[in-house]
Amino acid sequence: MMPAKLQLDVLRTLQSSARHGTQTLKNSNFLERFHKDRIVFCLPFFPALFLVPVQKVLQHLCLRFTQVAPYFIIQLFDLPSRHAENLAPLLASCRIQYTNCFSSSSNGQVPSIISLYLRVDLSPFYAKIFQISYRVPMIWLDVFQVFFVFLVISQHSLHS
């Protein structure tokens, strides 16, 4: 069990405004909803590719959450591979895992983003997701995500 003081530190860290942007928490009672040993961050696909200074974000997370490493696995999604490769040793040292749904698949098709978002959003296995918006209104991130998922579904429908 994580010590109460460390829980408060994590709470303050997640609720505070980072120098590199704004963390949007969808659930203020998230401390009661941590699942086992996992904190999940989801960098929405659109800003992760075009708007977010990903390297600064990861360095910030690593510095902030090193003390939490014995208690949680911090998991990142939608991390462009160039950032993951550059920061692999730093991520590993802080037990930060990443999943890159943009990596090129062997058959050359666009990797399915649908399964990733459904698994992250709906599966009880994962903890509450904290979306890091970085000066982009969350409503627009949601619109981009819905549009992209719709686009992928349409492409799958056309080819099936």
Curated annotation (Swiss-Prot):
It is a multi-pass membrane protein. The keyword Oxidoreductase does not apply. The chain crosses the membrane at residues 39-59, 136-156. Keywords: Membrane, Transmembrane, Transmembrane helix. It is found in: Membrane. Its main location: membrane. Signal peptide: none annotated. One of its GO terms (cellular component) is membrane. Completely overlaps YRF1-4. Belongs to the UPF0479 family. This is Putative UPF0479 protein YLR466C-A.
